[in-house]
Amino acid sequence: MNSLEQVKGLIKEEIQAAVLKAELATEEQIPNVVLESPKDKTNGDFSTNMAMQLARVAKKAPRMIAEELVANFDKAKASTEKIEIAGPGFINFYMDNSYLTDLIPTIVNAGEAYGETNTGKGEKVQVEFVSANPTGDLHLGHARGAAVGDTLCNLLAKAGYDVSREYYINDAGNQIHNLALSVEARYMQALGLEKEMPEDGYHGADIIGIGKRLAEEFGDRYAKADEKESYEFYREYGLKYELAKLQKDLESFRVKFDVWFSETSLYKNGKIDQALAVLKERDEIFEEDGATWFRSMTYGDDKNRVLIKNDGSYTYLTPDIAYHRDKLERGFDKLINIWGADHHGYIPRMKAAIQALGYDKETLEVEIIQMVQLYQNGEKMKMSKRTGKAVTLRELMEEVGVDAMRYFFAMRSGDSHLDFDMDLAVSKSNENPVYYAQYAHARVCSILRQGEELGLATGGDVNYKLVTSEKEVELLKKLGEFPAVVADAAQKRLPHRITNYAFELAATLHSFYNAEKVLNQDNLELSKARYELMKAVRTTLQNALAIVGVSAPEKM
């Protein structure tokens, strides 16, 4: 537990003790103590509505209850300087700030571990994201999903969850069939043979390249081979090539998956038949008009869904049900899917399937990612100026860099539309939020280098109690918030809270820097304490940016 959380814990304990001392309620009747941090700091560091919560039990007016609580509250035990009652009975606590200076060595000693909490208590969480068809380049929607998904995974891990990142490879549908036929056509053409591209084929230069490579490496071997053998070869070769390209792009984007799960494996391992057997055993499917239907309306879906069409083929839903059953059988406590906005209508039927399989529907959470609109020179950018096609993840990385992309994509709630200003993303100005946050880190590193020149890095005793100015206290309070921000953002699945925090910490640091002469050769004792404070800022900013997948440069 960090110092700030310890202080909050002490305040809660003293509130409970005051309730019992004032005989306002029994121990069993005391409600959960909620402490808020008021946005307006004139209302204190923390505030509680406990007096209102107790009104019914104590049978007194909240204001009167608040007065009794304050009279029985031990301020010394909870590092509290003063307590005020506001409005109908809010109790505002003003801390004496002695606890804040303890934060500096706490943060510095914790290093990369600062901000870690046990909120998740080791709960096994699987996050499935991106999962784009392996038949082409990743577009901006995939890029945003990758940034949000990976940031969420980093956040959950920081908050004590056991996280597994998974990519579902859609390798069993028509797209892969068309990919195989496209590879075959380009291979034949490279051999000088006539072969038309399939109607829904892939016409990109990369497939032409695959055809040429196959012709150079294998000659006409597969042109003469058995049709089934050659088809499997084209399919596997094309899929392997496209997956390698996806993996390379994602790794360049600092996204690595623990598991790459093949849809085809569900067919090969009998997982689809098993899932259907479970649904049949539980009387969740029925036959009608030659098709097999899932009774999804039983679980709140707007209509029942076909699982097996009258021609014997599966709908998209069938392997998806088998896949989610497989996930649950692997022992995950929570499944989080990051889906594009076009999948919103798919959520009720997927939750219905999980219920029908005998699991709690709340085991599945779906985070929706809205579309991204690029802007350049103040105008909407619909197509790549270089290729004339949709802008890809790779292209945008080359244009604006990974840091800007990771930060911009993660700085808004995923379910809100995102306008991405490419000019802003590369600008070296305070209006660019990623530059602003990174510059704060570089500024701190510069101060620390100056401190080393002054001999402040030699160790020895540090008088942290000298760190008392208004701007220093603001900075300490912001540093102390980090573990609580991590815990809350993880619980609520709101990764954009971390980019918000990084920006706020940077702003607080810049404000402190502009108001104070940070290091002063004429006051080395204060300078040493501030040197340690800067180390705490560096650690916290690094840790926040690391969650978002953004680098923390030492010089800019």
UniProtKB/Swiss-Prot annotation:
Answer yes or no on keyword Aminoacyl-tRNA synthetase: yes
* Record-linked InterPro entries: aa-tRNA-synth_I_CS (IPR001412), Arg-tRNA-ligase (IPR001278), Arg-tRNA-synth_N (IPR005148), Arg-tRNA-synth_N_sf (IPR036695), ArgRS_core (IPR035684), DALR_anticod-bd (IPR008909), Rossmann-like_a/b/a_fold (IPR014729), tRNAsynth_Ia_anticodon-bd (IPR009080)
Identify which top EC class this enzyme belongs to: ligase
- Which GO cellular component terms, listed alphabetically, does the Swiss-Prot or TrEMBL entry include? cytoplasm
Name any one GO molecular function: ATP binding
The alphabetized list of GO BP terms reads:
arginyl-tRNA aminoacylation
Query: Could you tell me the keywords of this UniProt record?
Result: Aminoacyl-tRNA synthetase, ATP-binding, Cytoplasm, Ligase, Nucleotide-binding, Protein biosynthesis
Reaction(s) catalysed by this chain's protein: tRNA(Arg) + L-arginine + ATP = L-arginyl-tRNA(Arg) + AMP + diphosphate
For the keyword Oxidoreductase, the answer is no
Q: Where in the cell is it found?
A: Cytoplasm
- What's the short name of a Pfam family annotated to this entry? DALR_1
**Listed PROSITE patterns:** AA_TRNA_LIGASE_I
Q: What is its main location?
A: cytoplasm
Please state the Enzyme Commission number of this protein. Answer: 6.1.1.19
Belongs to which family? Belongs to the class-I aminoacyl-tRNA synthetase family.
Describe the protein's quaternary organization and the partners it interacts with. Monomer.
- State what protein this is by name: Arginine--tRNA ligase 1
What is the species listed in this Swiss-Prot or TrEMBL entry?
Bacillus anthracis
